[in-house]
Regions:
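Residue-level marker of positions within ordered structural domains that often coincide
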Residues: 1, 29, 44, 71, ...
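Bacterial N-terminal signal peptides
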Residues: 1-7
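Sec/Tat signal peptide C-region and signal peptidase I cleavage site
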Residues: 8-14
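Short N-proximal segments of mature Sec-exported proteins
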Residues: 15-68, 88
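Short, charged low-complexity intrinsically disordered segments located at boundaries
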Residues: 52-54, 67-73, 93-97
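Short, compact, well-ordered microdomains
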Residues: 74-97
Length: 97
């Protein structure tokens, strides 16, 4: 049990836009880039926001949308990363009225 507890000690990273931007801008194939992919996929799949994504949209395309949004909006990076993911995808794939 002590060993298990020790595995989870250490500094806690804030899950804000700065953290996500760093992860998403990491080189493709790195652990950080994989964390970005998994995080965006998880937030997207849990989202209840009405979106009109193309049926063939890929995780890589969603990562590109979110990464571009984060890079283009540095003034928002202090916000929670889950909100930024939702905002980026909603901006790119909102349904036409």
């Amino acid at each position: 049990i002590t060993l298990l507890a020790a595995a989870f000690t250490g500094p806690v990273k804030a899950l804000d836009g700065n953290w996500l931007k760093d992860a998403c801008n990491a080189p493709y194939g790195t652990q950080d880039n994989g964390v970005c992919d998994g995080y965006i996929t998880g937030i997207h799949e849990m989202s209840t926001t009405r979106l009109c994504l193309p049926a063939d949209v890929t995780n890589i395309q969603l990562m590109d949308v979110v990464t571009r949004y984060l890079n283009d909006h540095p003034e928002r990076l202090n916000r929670k990363s889950r909100i930024l993911v939702q905002d980026a995808i909603k901006q790119a794939y909102s349904c036409k009225k």
